[in-house]
Amino acid sequence: MGKRAGGGATGATTAAVSTSAGAGLEPAAARSGGPRSAAAGLLGALHLVMTLVVAAARAEKEAFVQSESIIEVLRFDDGGLLQTETTLGLSSYQQKSISLYRGNCRPIRFEPPMLDFHEQPVGMPKMEKVYLHNPSSEETITLVSISATTSHFHASFFQNRKILPGGNTSFDVVFLARVVGNVENTLFINTSNHGVFTYQVFGVGVPNPYRLRPFLGARVPVNSSFSPIINIHNPHSEPLQVVEMYSSGGDLHLELPTGQQGGTRKLWEIPPYETKGVMRASFSSREADNHTAFIRIKTNASDSTEFIILPVEVEVTTAPGIYSSTEMLDFGTLRTQDLPKVLNLHLLNSGTKDVPITSVRPTPQNDAITVHFKPITLKASESKYTKVASISFDASKAKKPSQFSGKITVKAKEKSYSKLEIPYQAEVLDGYLGFDHAATLFHIRDSPADPVERPIYLTNTFSFAILIHDVLLPEEAKTMFKVHNFSKPVLILPNESGYIFTLLFMPSTSSMHIDNNILLITNASKFHLPVRVYTGFLDYFVLPPKIEERFIDFGVLSATEASNILFAIINSNPIELAIKSWHIIGDGLSIELVAVERGNRTTIISSLPEFEKSSLSDQSSVTLASGYFAVFRVKLTAKKLEGIHDGAIQITTDYEILTIPVKAVIAVGSLTCFPKHVVLPPSFPGKIVHQSLNIMNSFSQKVKIQQIRSLSEDVRFYYKRLRGNKEDLEPGKKSKIANIYFDPGLQCGDHCYVGLPFLSKSEPKVQPGVAMQEDMWDADWDLHQSLFKGWTGIKENSGHRLSAIFEVNTDLQKNIISKITAELSWPSILSSPRHLKFPLTNTNCSSEEEITLENPADVPVYVQFIPLALYSNPSVFVDKLVSRFNLSKVAKIDLRTLEFQVFRNSAHPLQSSTGFMEGLSRHLILNLILKPGEKKSVKVKFTPVHNRTVSSLIIVRNNLTVMDAVMVQGQGTTENLRVAGKLPGPGSSLRFKITEALLKDCTDSLKLREPNFTLKRTFKVENTGQLQIHIETIEISGYSCEGYGFKVVNCQEFTLSANASRDIIILFTPDFTASRVIRELKFITTSGSEFVFILNASLPYHMLATCAEALPRPNWELALYIIISGIMSALFLLVIGTAYLEAQGIWEPFRRRLSFEASNPPFDVGRPFDLRRIVGISSEGNLNTLSCDPGHSRGFCGAGGSSSRPSAGSHKQCGPSVHPHSSHSNRNSADVENVRAKNSSSTSSRTSAQAASSQSANKTSPLVLDSNTVTQGHTAGRKSKGAKQSQHGSQHHAHSPLEQHPQPPLPPPVPQPQEPQPERLSPAPLAHPSHPERASSARHSSEDSDITSLIEAMDKDFDHHDSPALEVFTEQPPSPLPKSKGKGKPLQRKVKPPKKQEEKEKKGKGKPQEDELKDSLADDDSSSTTTETSNPDTEPLLKEDTEKQKGKQAMPEKHESEMSQVKQKSKKLLNIKKEIPTDVKPSSLELPYTPPLESKQRRNLPSKIPLPTAMTSGSKSRNAQKTKGTSKLVDNRPPALAKFLPNSQELGNTSSSEGEKDSPPPEWDSVPVHKPGSSTDSLYKLSLQTLNADIFLKQRQTSPTPASPSPPAAPCPFVARGSYSSIVNSSSSSDPKIKQPNGSKHKLTKAASLPGKNGNPTFAAVTAGYDKSPGGNGFAKVSSNKTGFSSSLGISHAPVDSDGSDSSGLWSPVSNPSSPDFTPLNSFSAFGNSFNLTGEVFSKLGLSRSCNQASQRSWNEFNSGPSYLWESPATDPSPSWPASSGSPTHTATSVLGNTSGLWSTTPFSSSIWSSNLSSALPFTTPANTLASIGLMGTENSPAPHAPSTSSPADDLGQTYNPWRIWSPTIGRRSSDPWSNSHFPHEN
């Protein structure tokens, strides 16, 4: 109880009225009570409180609060503060009172003496006032407190604490009944001096008229809620409106039952005599304690003194346990005739673990209570209540009041939880309202009748009065009924009857039955008064399968057929009907009663099978109660006559005669099933069998099939109509109407006796049910046993034989029956015998037997053959398995043998979707997938290990029967053979003894006949084994049939059966070389066995010599001797002749060179390096001799190897060498002739040659390209050429390093690193090092004499732009550079009109150099040396050059300005070199060199070919052409050639100034020298060393013997007019794109560096240092024919001489003195020999000042230098060429051309200067002859080594090769004494 202080009212009352409703209630109260303010409502609600407060004010400072057992006295002391006295038990008060006043009269008097409240409804308080009188005249009684021990009574405080003598006071007592029944209590009044006075109070609690009850005893856990619904009953005849509802606050809140926030007034309006839930009291428990609250309800029926106060007491606890959602199961008010009322029990588990609920039962046992409970577990700590049980109360079973209430006991399995008890109660009203049933029963006549009125009387058997408030008619009855004379309400006293109303019935014509209820609304809930209207008619329908229900239609019947039809009659009237009779109308009909039962239409149809069998024919009448039916059978027996038959059935009742028509058509004929008995083949789950069902129609008309059905309930039998089946059966025919199927799997589902799911090892193993797994077979036997047990169970119960009956109905005949029989079987996938017996088998061999499998199922079957040995414990089931499959008993089954292996040759192994793969899955396990019905055979191989009999089992695992087994038995044995009774082996010696007597012919001097020394012996060969032996071959020590003198005569194959024998004859014929011959006789059988016996022959030792002499000699011996002698003699003479010719070939060039050097006047040091002056020294006849083939490059008309090279451009080598470096393959003189012939077609052979060579120079010099090709060329050349040639080559190669474009995709065919590698510094390995000197000297000799004439011719030709041979243009590769690059395919030569080429050039021009650079970069994968794109860094320089060349007229400039420009350029070059790491590819030394003056003049040529740019453009344009796929090839043409062409041609085919515009200077020109280490330094050193090489060169003049086999490199002075420094620069400066494959950056390739370092010949280093100035040889693209040739000049597009000066200074300051490689200026290491160039050499060259940097730069300008400059000292027997590791320079190689150096299979096959096998070399097109023609095409691509064949076409593309001096001339067999063609290609 709430504790409240105050007077007047009890704490309970005060609490109830002092607090307004909770959040949800206040608006509800306001709405229900109408519009009033909250304050007004609160004041009204506190009406009772005010009364109590007033009374409390009169009580003096005292109050009490009471509970059941404790009295707590509250006393007000003087200070007005309420203090709590010691709380005493009730007994202490009584004792104190008794002790004080024993024997005395009471000093105080109560009025009334005791208080009786009489009956009060529960929850409705009543207050009475009690007065206290003090009868004493003296004493003042001081009242301390008042208390009680019950919660039903509450007392207020006293009006006055002190009662004066004779005075009085009063207090109020409130009775608030909580339960129904008597309540009494004693109030204790404590005084200060007079002890304790007692006062008795009484009351009786009666049921609340509103059926409200207090909510007491609720127990909930903390943080849970208690939410009962407040249901209010309206006991009034008027609607009851709930006006207000309040809670005392705290944790109690009021909510709408629906959970909504508000509602309308209707929500709180309760119709009369109805009960409605109006509010939900929600108590939320926040803390553990006993909580008390009150709910006050006010209605519109309440007066000012009537209150409804409901106490709410809730115990909130923290103890874990089970709690109920309600404190009581209140079933409410029930009548005995009501249906049972059901309430649900919801529980909550507040514990920490789940609790199973074990039982829910009523206590005590109560028949009226039924508990529907299933064991359930309450989850721990759930916040929601769980439904545990349903409790139903059946009022009809509650016979006594003790059954109206009790407890429901809930027990949990948790012992620590106490049992939970929930009280229940119900108010049962015993009684009913009686009425006359006939009064509410009405009959509808056929004709309309008058309205009928019937008074309705009701009898009340209840113990209380029944007040009928309203009468309601159902909707369907309102049309015929009305209620009259009902004045509400009507009261019927208990056990009395009374008139209620009159029911008016107005029948309607529509005959309908009404069976409904009139609703009576009373104070005892609602009553249903049944009212029924009936017609008395019967309902009937014909039972299925007939479609027509209203008449009996037999359809078409055969004349002999009798048919039955059932029909039912139903009495749906509310009265019973008597069927008096039934009879038939018509012939052949009969009727009988089948059944009479209660039910409706559904019941009848469901019982149809029973009705068809039953019969009640003995009855003639029957009475049908309401809701009953009768079933009749009508039988028609057809007559023989055909026709329509009509009849009827009549059924008579009191109300009607029911007539049912009958129809039939009778036809003659019959239908029969065929076959009558269908026997289906055996099947099993997984196999569906079927058979067709046919019907024979003997009627004379079509018969229509109406129905096919199975009369059995077995779902495994079913039928399917086929698409082709017709509905009509043709007369006189047998028709197939359906297929009857039997599917055994339909009934067993997942539990069939065969068939399991199969899981492959890749599938997850989690699968419900039993399944087989691919890789787990140890449980197979258990699975098999369980399945087989199921099968045996079926078989034992005869469940394997099944039958069904199918019925076919047609329109003419019904019930055509066919019996179907099916049989279940145990399947097997084995279709071959289970016992495999192998024949005797040799232990070395195998025998095979076949097992045939067939899948009998309709689903795939997964099969695994597993040897028994693979089971972990086979002994457990082997015996059972043998008996299970009736396998024949054997002595012993080997459980561990693996001698039997199953295999299958399947070309297309299947794989299931699950991952199960056919074939051998692991050791000895064979997997198979059998599709439905598929047959497969597998082979079992028996490979015996021992000579014994082996028996084992092969388990056939499958997911159909799990296991099947095959018994395999085989015997192993060996083949045994004896010869002459001896076993094979070392001891089995078969003796042949030749005695002296047999050799008597040896000593026969007459020798009249051929001596015969053959000994013959016969041996017996026996087969002593069990196997038949087939001897395949007989060998004698490895020779078949005969050998070493032995011979088997009958040596054919033969066969020996067991224990058979055969004779063999062996002959022995000695050769008398040994006295004892021991050999092996080997018999080899078809099974592979070998039997070895020893043949032992002995001869008399002393007769060996004699007999050997007696042997005859062969007749061909003498002839052979003569032939061999002749051949050797001829070969000797041939060698002598060849040696002479070779000596001549070496001596002539050498002599020519000596004469050239002798006639070469000294040069002025101060004058520019002018090649023309040098050339002028030599006669032009030499030039003619050389005929400078188009293949010749421009520096030296031919430097030894160029002549042999196919043309630098075309690279068709005569030799087979395919190496890219072998592109300098030897050219036959035929090539040269072809070239000349083609050249002669143009203006002059020289011009054409020069043009071609320049073109090839352009093309080849581009070819100089690849570091790959270059390096390869170098290595080849290095090996093949002499030192001098190698020097020239090195120059050219030096160019090619510049041209190297890193082409990672094209690795150098030869793994010679392009990067400088110090170890490579050693002399390059020569292809044929034995002749190092020859190659070089050969080249030198040819060069020297022809150079002067050649250069003069070139200069003369320079002025002609006329008609160079069109062949020059034909080289244009149609494909872009990448093609030729990568593929090394010969470029197709297309002759394009100059205009087209010019247009293409213009297109190229349109593209900025940047684009060209991009293009070339794009094309240049690895190291395309010939790409025309300029290095981005050098582009400005190039552009500058091109601009100058385009805009300027060729004005002669002073050499000083040229020198300064050269210096500037070289400086720029140096910077660029530092910035851009590139692979320095020396361009071919064939680049023409043009002095600056001449180059400027050339720029002014009408063809606009500024020579410097022309060169670069030539080389570059060539690249550009290939890169872009345009005809820019023309740009690659040497300017000189351009001179001979028309302007258009110049533009198209030569690099005119416009061409140069299009094509930025060659990348090698513009690219700074790539430094491997410090390339600039090394080049600088090289230049210094070259300057210091004077003495060496002098020696070279006198001693021309080359020390290096490397190809004679044309001296740079003669290199295509390129200055030496330009060569150096070109080699050292590399294309921006040229990256060393090893990725070294900003380093000159060592190829360009000193010979000793880069692995390139010094010349290559010089070439690397080659100046790229426009005037310099920049990158003399593979020697251009003339200085004018654009290729050579274009190469000079180096940044060093952007001014276009042709002289880039032979010693361009490429080298950096500060570089570590720096050497003194004048020291030059030529091929490993250092020498000083400043001496005689430079005095001859005309160097006037010491070689400082400027002078070195000016060296570009020196056009000529004696070839001896490049010769290695004779003292070097082997060249010190280091294998060019860094910058293989194809250019050098190309310059050197196809030098057929003795040691290079291809000219320069392994060029000294090229470690890279790139086909890019102009000559290295081995694979692509044309590609090499367009050097640019092959520049980067190491061409596949294809033997390059020389052809005239080659010459077209060849650049003018200074080395052409060495090319074979008409009068010379070969300029290269050791042409490459004579030696196989190195690689």
Swiss-Prot record:
<feature type="compositionally biased region" description="Basic and acidic residues">
    <location>
        <begin position="1395"/>
        <end position="1417"/>
    </location>
</feature>
<feature type="compositionally biased region" description="Pro residues">
    <location>
        <begin position="1302"/>
        <end position="1316"/>
    </location>
</feature>
<feature type="modified residue" description="Phosphoserine">
    <location>
        <position position="1871"/>
    </location>
</feature>
<dbReference type="Pfam" id="PF24498">
    <property type="entry name" value="Ig_TMEM131L_3"/>
</dbReference>
<feature type="glycosylation site" description="N-linked (GlcNAc...) asparagine">
    <location>
        <position position="300"/>
    </location>
</feature>
<feature type="compositionally biased region" description="Pro residues">
    <location>
        <begin position="1602"/>
        <end position="1611"/>
    </location>
</feature>
<feature type="modified residue" description="Phosphoserine">
    <location>
        <position position="803"/>
    </location>
</feature>
<feature type="transmembrane region" description="Helical">
    <location>
        <begin position="1118"/>
        <end position="1138"/>
    </location>
</feature>
<dbReference type="Pfam" id="PF24501">
    <property type="entry name" value="Ig_TMEM131L_5"/>
</dbReference>
<feature type="compositionally biased region" description="Polar residues">
    <location>
        <begin position="1678"/>
        <end position="1690"/>
    </location>
</feature>
<feature type="modified residue" description="Phosphoserine">
    <location>
        <position position="1342"/>
    </location>
</feature>
<dbReference type="GO" id="GO:0005518">
    <property type="term" value="F:collagen binding"/>
</dbReference>
<comment type="similarity">
    <text>Belongs to the TMEM131 family.</text>
</comment>
<feature type="compositionally biased region" description="Low complexity">
    <location>
        <begin position="1237"/>
        <end position="1261"/>
    </location>
</feature>
<dbReference type="InterPro" id="IPR022113">
    <property type="entry name" value="TMEM131-like_N"/>
</dbReference>
<keyword id="KW-1133">Transmembrane helix</keyword>
<dbReference type="InterPro" id="IPR013783">
    <property type="entry name" value="Ig-like_fold"/>
</dbReference>
<dbReference type="Pfam" id="PF24499">
    <property type="entry name" value="Ig_TMEM131L_4"/>
</dbReference>
<feature type="region of interest" description="Disordered">
    <location>
        <begin position="1766"/>
        <end position="1789"/>
    </location>
</feature>
<feature type="compositionally biased region" description="Low complexity">
    <location>
        <begin position="1837"/>
        <end position="1849"/>
    </location>
</feature>
<dbReference type="InterPro" id="IPR045695">
    <property type="entry name" value="TMEM131-like_Ig_dom2"/>
</dbReference>
<feature type="compositionally biased region" description="Basic and acidic residues">
    <location>
        <begin position="1330"/>
        <end position="1343"/>
    </location>
</feature>
<feature type="compositionally biased region" description="Basic and acidic residues">
    <location>
        <begin position="1353"/>
        <end position="1364"/>
    </location>
</feature>
<dbReference type="InterPro" id="IPR055437">
    <property type="entry name" value="Ig_TMEM131L_5"/>
</dbReference>
<dbReference type="GO" id="GO:0016020">
    <property type="term" value="C:membrane"/>
</dbReference>
<keyword id="KW-0732">Signal</keyword>
<feature type="region of interest" description="Disordered">
    <location>
        <begin position="1593"/>
        <end position="1656"/>
    </location>
</feature>
<dbReference type="InterPro" id="IPR055436">
    <property type="entry name" value="Ig_TMEM131L_4"/>
</dbReference>
<dbReference type="InterPro" id="IPR039877">
    <property type="entry name" value="TMEM131-like"/>
</dbReference>
<feature type="topological domain" description="Cytoplasmic">
    <location>
        <begin position="1139"/>
        <end position="1883"/>
    </location>
</feature>
<feature type="compositionally biased region" description="Low complexity">
    <location>
        <begin position="1423"/>
        <end position="1434"/>
    </location>
</feature>
<feature type="compositionally biased region" description="Basic residues">
    <location>
        <begin position="1380"/>
        <end position="1394"/>
    </location>
</feature>
<feature type="compositionally biased region" description="Basic and acidic residues">
    <location>
        <begin position="1436"/>
        <end position="1458"/>
    </location>
</feature>
<feature type="compositionally biased region" description="Polar residues">
    <location>
        <begin position="1510"/>
        <end position="1526"/>
    </location>
</feature>
<feature type="compositionally biased region" description="Low complexity">
    <location>
        <begin position="1619"/>
        <end position="1630"/>
    </location>
</feature>
<dbReference type="InterPro" id="IPR056311">
    <property type="entry name" value="Ig_TMEM131_2"/>
</dbReference>
<feature type="modified residue" description="Phosphoserine">
    <location>
        <position position="1863"/>
    </location>
</feature>
<feature type="topological domain" description="Lumenal">
    <location>
        <begin position="23"/>
        <end position="1117"/>
    </location>
</feature>
<protein>
    <recommendedName>
        <fullName>Transmembrane protein 131</fullName>
    </recommendedName>
</protein>
<keyword id="KW-0597">Phosphoprotein</keyword>
<feature type="region of interest" description="Disordered">
    <location>
        <begin position="1670"/>
        <end position="1712"/>
    </location>
</feature>
<dbReference type="GO" id="GO:0032964">
    <property type="term" value="P:collagen biosynthetic process"/>
</dbReference>
